[in-house]
Amino acid sequence: MNSVLERVYEIGIIPVIAFNSVDEAIPLCKALMDGGLPAAEVTFRTACAEECIKKIHEELPNMLLGAGTVLTVDQADRAMAAGASFIVAPGFDPEVCKHVIDKGGIMMPGTATSGEMQQAMNMGCEVVKFFPAEANGGVDKLKNIGAALKTCKWMCTGGVNAKNVNNYLGYNQIIAVGGTWMCKSDKIKAGAWDEITAMSKEAVNVMLGLELGHIGINCADEAEAAKTAETIASLLSMAVKPGNSSIFVGKKEFEIMKKPGRGTHGHIAILTNNVDRAIYHLSQRGVKFDMDSKNVKDGKTIAIYFADEVAGFAIHLVQK
C-alpha cells in the first residue's frame, strides 16, 4: 500500500464528520488528535465541507484528511485542491473513480457487491469502501467475498461502533473502519471537546486491546529456573510446562528463563489485537521501540520490544 493507505491502516479508526460550521473544524480535530485519532473523513453532506478541509489542512498538517460523500467530479477536484489525501464515495461511480485515479488521487468508492468491488479493483482502486457495512451483511459477508477477491481491501463504515469494531479490524483484508461514535453530532454542536477526546481515547484502547500476556523471569541457569518454576507453581497450584529455553508456569502466565534473557530481571509480554497499530499509537504517546527486535510474519508484525526497560523489565508487544 502507498504511504497514505499505510497510515489509514495504522490509525485504524477514521472518524466520519459532517461539519455544520467552519468554526467547529479546528477544535474538533484537535480533540480527535488529543484522543489519539489524527484523521477524519469530512463529508460533503454540508456546504462548509470544502472550507473545513482547507482550514484543517493548513492549520493542522499532521491531520490525515479524507473527503467523504463525494458524488461528482467537481466535488472530487475541490476536495483534493483543499487538501484531502483520499476521496470516499457512498457508491460506485466509474466516472468519478477514473477521474480521481487519473489525477493521481486515492479513491475509495462505496461498494456492496462483489461485482462492484471487482470493477473498482480493475479500475485501480487499492481499497474500496464497504457501505453500509452492517446492513449489507457485515464482516461475515466480506469473509465470503474475500475468499475469492484475495487482494481486495476494505474500509468499512455504516453501523460500526465500539462493540463490533474489532470484529471488522480482526479480518486482515479490512484496513480500517469509519465511524461517528466518538464524535456524535450532538457533542459537536455542544462543543463538548473534552468528551470527544475521552471517547476517542476509549475507541483507541478498545481497538488495541492491550492486556498482560505473561511475565518472564530471568534465571542464572536451568537449575535455578526449575526451582523458581516449581516454587511459583506450588504457590498458585499451577502446572509446569518445560520448554527448550524456558519453563512456562500455568497457562503461560509465567515464563521462567533457563539463562539470562532480555531485561535486567526479565520481560513482560503485552498482548494486542494488532502490533502494527499498537506501534503507531504508542509511538504517538512517546514510546520508543527497538526496531531491530521486530518479528514479522506474512507481512505483519507479530512481536516487538520497547527500546527502554521499565523497572528492570524489558517489555514487548505480542500479537494475540
Show which residues each predicted segment covers.
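N-terminal beta-strand motif that seeds the catalytic metal site of vicinal oxygen chelate
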Residues: 4-18, 204-229, 263-270
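Conserved, mostly hydrophobic/aromatic
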Residues: 15, 32, 79, 128, ...
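Catalytic beta/alpha-barrel core
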Residues: 16-18, 39-46, 63-71, 84-92, ...
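Core segments of cupin and vicinal oxygen chelate
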Residues: 28, 45-47, 216-254, 284, ...
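Catalytic cores of alpha/beta
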Residues: 28, 72-82, 115-123, 140, ...
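Glycine-rich phosphate-binding active-site loops on the catalytic face of alpha/beta enzymes
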Residues: 90-96, 129-139, 173-196
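C-terminal helical cap(s) of enzyme catalytic domains, especially alpha/beta-barrels
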Residues: 100-105, 186-209
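Vicinal oxygen chelate
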Residues: 252-258, 283-320
